[in-house]
């Protein structure tokens, strides 16, 4: 026989009053009203100085149904880390324009906002320094081999800089990169030496333009391409337009067509060619850093160069977690870290300029 308490509970559930009460609650959870409530709570949680639009990172972490609703509402991504305001409070700011120029005589010039407006006397010409660009095209003319003077520009961690060479070629240098180049090119030859990453817009002059790296040599006449040649990483030459010849220096060479990429593992001497979306590999010049199904360790290696940070992992397995996203190059890193946290696969804390990942 059922107990008296069970019978009372059954009678309560079956009562008109209980049914009406819960029917009202059910009606309260219609989708329109529900999402308005969510939006209200989200806006209350929005503590950040700048809004981060959902579409910046939505492909990485947010479920499809939330993508649709948030996109239609055109609302900002909430500060998703309830109870953990440390990531937002401890700002890690993006890099900026800065470099060090070493002249042929050994003199060094710091290129940053403090050097804006300064002039250099080179080859009898006044070279104007801007906070983001150094333009050598004013030092016109060509000289013989005996008179060549080489300068070297080095971009530190957390920096970027644009250089216009004597022939009008524009070079965008990424963080932790350097370029050695002549003040003026010798007759019939244009050659520079690159370490790190740079995006080249080569001016057509009728003479070959050669970029030498530790593992590859790229020869062009007039074209646009990106070279990534960081020590310890795969070397990549990505052709946007024109034509380039890639040579390993070990008897293997090939000619790239637009939208092709040549990659080389240092020391292997073996070049691999594939067709790629060039915008993915050159977007850093336009303010975005793209990642597609990449290991967390590789993602953070790239970001550490730009944000001037160190990265630690409490568990080696975390390095192999894969993500796809893009990061706005000129924003703080906190929104990206918060969205990593939102996956619930990984946790993040900041200790000064070190980012620590743990389970």
Question: Predicted segment positions?
Answer:
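A generic alpha-helix structural signal
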Residues: 1, 35, 39, 300, ...
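Extended, compositionally biased eukaryotic interaction scaffolds
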Residues: 7-11, 26, 34, 75-76
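A residue-level detector for the "anchor" residue at the start of short, highly conserved motifs
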Residues: 46-57, 68-359
């Amino acid at each position: 026989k059922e107990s008296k308490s069970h019978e009372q509970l059954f009678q309560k559930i079956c009562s008109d009053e209980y049914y009406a009460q819960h029917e009202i609650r059910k009606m309260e959870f219609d989708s329109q009203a529900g999402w308005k409530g969510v939006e209200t709570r989200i806006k209350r949680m929005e503590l950040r100085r700048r809004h981060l639009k959902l579409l910046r990172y939505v492909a990485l972490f947010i479920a499809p149904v939330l993508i649709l609703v948030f996109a239609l509402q055109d609302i900002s991504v909430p500060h998703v880390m309830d109870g953990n305001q440390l990531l937002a409070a401890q700002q890690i700011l993006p890099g900026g324009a800065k470099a060090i120029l070493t002249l042929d005589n050994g003199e060094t010039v710091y290129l940053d906002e403090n050097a804006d407006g300064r002039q250099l006397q080179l080859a009898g010409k006044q070279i104007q320094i801007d906070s983001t660009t150094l333009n050598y095209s004013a030092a016109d003319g060509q000289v013989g081999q005996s008179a060549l003077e080489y300068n070297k520009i080095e971009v530190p961690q957390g920096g970027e800089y644009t250089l216009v060479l004597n022939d009008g070629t524009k070079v965008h240098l990424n963080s932790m990169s350097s370029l050695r180049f002549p003040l003026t090119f010798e007759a019939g030859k244009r050659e520079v030496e690159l370490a790190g990453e740079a995006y080249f817009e080569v001016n057509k002059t009728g003479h070959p333009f050669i970029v030498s790296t530790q593992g590859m040599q790229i020869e062009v006449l007039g074209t646009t391409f990106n070279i990534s040649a960081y020590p310890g990483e795969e070397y990549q030459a990505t052709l946007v337009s024109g034509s380039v010849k890639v040579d390993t220096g070990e008897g293997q060479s090939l000619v790239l067509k637009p939208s092709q990429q040549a990659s080389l593992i240092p020391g292997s001497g073996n070049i691999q060619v594939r067709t790629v979306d060039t915008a993915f590999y050159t977007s850093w010049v336009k303010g975005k850093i793209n990642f597609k199904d990449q290991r967390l360790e590789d993602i953070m290696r790239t970001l550490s160069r730009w944000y001037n940070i160190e990265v630690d992992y409490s568990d080696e397995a975390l390095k192999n977690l894969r993500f796809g996203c893009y990061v706005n190059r000129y924003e703080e890193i906190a929104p990206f870290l918060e969205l990593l946290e939102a996956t619930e696969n990984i946790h993040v804390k900041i200790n000064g300029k070190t980012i620590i990942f743990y389970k």
